[in-house]
A protein has these predicted regions:
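ATP-binding N-terminal substructure of ATP-dependent carboxylate-amine bond-forming enzymes
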Residues: 1-125, 138-146, 395-398
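ATP-dependent carboxylate activation and anion-phosphoryl transfer catalytic cores
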Residues: 7-26, 48-50, 71-73, 89, ...
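Conserved beta3 strand of the protein kinase N-lobe
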Residues: 133-134
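Acidic/histidine-enriched active-site and ligand-binding environments that engage anionic O-linkages
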Residues: 147-156
């Protein structure tokens, strides 16, 4: 086992990794920007090193600064968390060259899955179902039109190098294609420094389903089942749950076995998430793979009793899957997670500032992952996520009731949060009945006369 790990992240996920380190008897080293000097991840780490000013490019995304901190602290490994440098293959390579273990997959696999059209090709070759679409990068809007005619409208053009809805456009007819193609290309180039696009058939009213896997460095891959992530706004997830009401036990087993075989074939290791769109006929189509721990990993932890972050660390330290899991995966009950963001619940504008009161809920089956606290300051420089409220219950109905109760008891004052939005979602009849898709939030907000 490692003696010391540096966490190349901040706030909630950094604190989550620190908890795992402490339980494994590993010393945790935090890094922080000047804006995060009073953050809880700094307080609870065994060591903490300031790596620069508040701006991401000068601190958390500054690879030389992060590696320098790791060398100063003499760490064995680096855990990247999610976001920031977590899926940066160059960062993983620099860790390797510096003699520091990167807690994640090999750089070449991260790079493969980061180039979306190559990931599609690799998964198609391995037998994973994908949507009809282009083969490789599309060079021009003329070539895009040729593919669109083959696939059939509507289609969606996507940035090869990115995600989160940027560099993405839905095209419903031939007349729209040139303008939307150029707009997606420009947005992708601005967001990711790479304007490459590919195309897929667009699925109307899909669900967003993802599967969690763990793979050791000895060839063993295990599926931990799926998460339902369809409640999202502008491709940003708001609420997740496990299991999905639309995935049967037979589907769960079939897809899980297929993914384990596919990932073993490409030499994948550590935690990973494979994302799918589900069409109206409940067929799953691969869209991308995230080669890191996900924000929403707690819902899987709650229904499987597997600590995914501790598993990541153990796998990176060379443990075999039989020692990591200590038995077969068994799913119990239902879990829901609400992302609490520092945003106006109707306008969705960021809400930085001092938290004047903070009282997270408790009780049976309730978990709160957060680095926020009373009198703490939410800086304006970073992602708006301040807490994740997670519940577990015997079934979905009880989980909804428990989450509703927990939201009512979650006090955050001094800043706006999305807690009121989550209360309204949990009370919605369609949500409670499981009648939703990725367009649910837009329809929900339009129905209530709120902003989208």
């Amino acid at each position: 086992m490692f003696k010391k790990i540096l966490i190349a992240n901040r706030a909630e996920i950094a604190l989550r990794v620190i908890c795992a380190c402490k339980e494994l008897g590993v010393r945790a080293v935090a890094i922080y920007s000047e804006a995060d000097r009073n953050s809880l991840h700094v307080r609870f780490a065994d060591e903490a090193i300031c790596i620069g000013p508040p701006r991401l490019a000068e601190s958390y995304l500054n690879i030389p600064a992060v590696i320098s901190a790791a060398e100063i602290a003499n760490v064995d490994a680096i855990h990247p968390g999610y976001g920031l440098l977590a899926e940066n293959a160059n960062f993983a390579e620099v860790c390797e060259m510096s003699g520091i273990k990167f807690i994640g997959p090999r750089p070449e696999v991260t790079r493969l899955m980061g180039e979306k059209e190559k990931a599609r090709a690799a998964m198609k070759k391995a037998g994973v179902p994908i949507l009809p679409g282009s083969e490789g990068i599309i060079a021009s809007d003329g070539e895009a039109l040729e593919w669109a005619k083959q696939v059939g409208f509507p289609v969606i053009v996507k940035a090869s190098a990115g995600g989160g809805g940027r560099g993405m456009r839905i095209v419903r007819n031939e007349e729209e294609l040139p303008g939307l193609f150029k707009a997606a290309q420009a947005e992708a180039a601005g967001a990711f420094g790479n304007g490459d696009l590919y195309m897929e058939k667009y699925v109307e009213h899909p669900r967003h389903i993802e599967f969690q896997v763990l793979a050791d460095e000895h060839g063993s891959v295990v599926s931990l089942g799926e998460r339902e992530c369809s409640i999202q706004r502008r491709h940003q997830k708001l609420l997740e749950e496990s299991p999905s009401t639309q995935v049967t036990p037979e589907m769960r087993t079939q897809i899980g076995e297929m993914l384990c075989k596919s990932l073993a074939a490409i030499g994948y290791w550590n935690a990973g998430t494979i994302e799918f769109l589900m069409d109206k006929d409940r067929r799953l189509h691969f869209i991308e793979m995230n080669t890191r721990i996900q924000v929403e990993h707690p819902v899987t932890e709650m229904v499987t009793d597997v600590d995914l972050v501790k598993s990541q660390i153990m796998i990176a330290a060379g443990a075999k899957m039989s020692d990591v899991l200590m038995g077969p995966i068994v799913h119990r009950g239902h879990s829901i997670e609400c992302r609490v963001n520092a945003e106006h619940p109707e306008k969705f504008t960021p809400s930085a500032g001092k938290i004047t009161a903070f009282n997270p809920p408790g009780g049976t089956g309730v978990r709160v992952d957060t680095a926020a606290y009373a009198e703490g300051v939410i800086p304006p420089y970073y992602d708006s996520l301040i807490a994740k409220l997670i519940v577990r219950a015997k079934d979905r109905s009880e989980a909804i009731s428990r989450m509703s109760r927990a939201l009512d008891m979650f006090i955050v004052e001094g800043i706006y949060t999305t807690i009121p939005l989550h209360r309204r979602i949990l009370a919605d009849e369609d949500f409670r009945a499981g009648n939703f898709d990725t367009g649910f939030i837009e329809r929900f907000l339009a129905k209530s006369g709120k902003a989208t």
